[in-house]
Amino acid sequence: MQKSLVSLAWVFVAILGAICLGVLALHKGESINTLWLVVASACIYSIGYRFYSHFIAYKVLKLDDSRATPACVRNDGKDFVPTDKAITFGHHFAAIAGAGPLVGPILAAQMGYLPSILWILIGSVLGGCVHDFVVLFASIRRDGKSLGEMIKLEMGQFVGMIASLGILGIMLIIIAILAMVVVKALAHSPWGFFTIAMTIPIAILMGLYMRFFRPHKILEVSVIGFILLIIAIYAGKYVSLDPKLASIFTFEASSLAWMIMGYGFVASILPVWFLLAPRDYLSTFLKIGVIGVLVVAIIFVAPPLQIPKITPFVDGSGPVFAGSVFPFLFITVACGTISGFHALISSGTTPKMLAKESDARLVGYGSMVMESVVALMALVCAGILHPGLYFAINSPEVSIGKDIADAASVISSWGFNISAEEIREMTKNIGESSILSRTGGAPTFAIGLAMIVYHILGDPSVMAFWYHFAILFEALFILTAVDAGTRTARFMIQDLLGNVYKPLGDLSSYKAGIFATLLCVAGWGYFLYQGTIDPKGGIYTLWPLFGVSNQMLAGMALLLVTVVLFKMGRFKGAMISALPAVLILSITFYSGILKVVPKSDNSVLNNVSHVAQMQIIKEKMATTTDEKALKTLQKSFFNHAIDAILCVFFMLVALLVLIVSVRICSNAYFKNKIYPPLAETPYIKAS
């Protein structure tokens, strides 16, 4: 009887989710209540976790709690530590929930809310959550090894080396785009810059406090840090109101790029306890707390989505990012649905913390469910804005101009009527000098959050504080990711350099570490600076490259797991990773090809393609006589050439992994030939 009632309850959940999703898809009015989205997502995620993740865990992967995990076998109290699954879940979620799920859906909102909602809900349950879960499983069974090491073990030395180069390149692109989100949010914002600058001495104070005064008191020091952050936000308001102080803390995007490069270099070579660890503690508590409060606030306020279900920009003519709904929506949403970056975390610190194999279900699948919830919240923050305001914030200067009146006129001509006065009013409410062309997603999310708080409190004067609180919230954990990413990429560079000159691979060598860090910062710093001087705002051209590379990394990780499952003889079960891999790689190969096709009569494709842009720039260079304009064109030509070369390189790496994966799987299925042999660690019974 009880079993029947439970079954009926799940049937009800499924029907309710289908109805709510149907309403979102078929609604024809000007706006729709966000509660439909909240209920639909809750139902779909619940069903996905309860049934699909259970099927994967116990029918395909066959998780075994009697088998000792790497954390138990190699428990050293430092890197390998068996940890409660709730704590591991928090650590893993904090590590994967970077800028991607906030920025991608906000950019994709230019096409309307429906395409993003469908891809986030369906793609995450069947693809992204599976990806994180199965990569974590593979690493647990291989002594907590990294993605590159596992590819080397399961596919061969040569493939592993090439894949490691590709992974490093992708890592540098990821760090650059993360840093760019912060730069775009803080440019010309003395309030924002002052607040973020204050987080450095606050984090150092926390590090010293924990190191010398109150060791291991993480909660205590995080509360102190949070109080100091709130004080810094309030102080930032008065800095922005004082003309002299405001001028001191106001910077151009290009200047901020150099500052973040310097910060990234110094932070990554300092002891972890001094800056990185306290920032991590603070950003983790802040991240989980803000996301939890935002979910409750959205349910309480239930603001209407004002952005249309589908906009005219599905054809790729939109100003926010280049490309049509297929394939570029998929790579733009990126981390909100599936992210190759997560494979680096699922094969990094997390597998060294799991106390039981069954914990991988909650940590791997469950954390990605939470990340896709964050993506939906970001979409809500963009969707509740007046569409004209959304495009005023996210369109590059070259599309709408510098003047508010001109911007309002251009945006209104697109069919999203907005007045200059409405833009000025929002600018005043959030305490900024301008909101035009604040590309990168972070300002949009911050304004959306501030509006939700305003609807609760009913006082527009609170919007400025909450806007800057949201900017702080985003910048804090993005900078933490930049710190950690630079440090991780440094290790990858030293590992590769060690194959050429052994002393450079010595992780204990201070000089080798500094040299590798310089190479790393120069790598991601180039792309960051390129984005800050790009006339289209950087995000317009760089985010698609980030999306392509990130999704290709996810595809390679899924291919690795498919190879592992074929070697284990679980041919039918391997479809859980093989099918998403085929879909993701098909989308990314297609989008990658579109980014290197030559110039044509199709203006949308010309905007997408780096090669087409090179041809267009070359034509302009032939007719330009102004020396300054010519130098700008030459820089732009070179940047597009680098982007095109990287895109081709990433595709070749993914193609190599695909070909080798197909060969290994074919041999396993048709010839029962397992080579290279399965690299799973021997079974050790858990104590």
Curated annotation (Swiss-Prot):
Pfam families (UniProt xref): CstA
Chain segments annotated as transmembrane: 6-26, 29-49, 87-107, 117-137, 162-182, 190-210, 221-241, 256-276, 285-305, 325-345, 373-393, 440-460, 462-482, 513-533, 546-566, 574-594, 642-662
Membrane topology, record value: Multi-pass membrane protein
Main localization (coarse): membrane
InterPro entries: CstA, CstA_N
Keyword Transmembrane: yes
GO biological process: cellular response to nutrient levels; cellular response to starvation; peptide transport; protein transport
CC per GO annotation: plasma membrane
Protein localization: Cell inner membrane
Alphabetized UniProt keyword annotations: Cell inner membrane, Cell membrane, Membrane, Peptide transport, Protein transport, Transmembrane, Transmembrane helix, Transport
Stored PANTHER family: INNER MEMBRANE PEPTIDE TRANSPORTER, PYRUVATE_PROTON SYMPORTER BTST
Protein task: Involved in peptide utilization.
UniProt family annotation: Belongs to the peptide transporter carbon starvation (CstA) (TC 2.A.114) family.
Protein name in UniProt: Peptide transporter CstA
Native source organism of the sequence: Helicobacter pylori (strain ATCC 700392 / 26695) (Campylobacter pylori)
Gene designation per UniProt: cstA
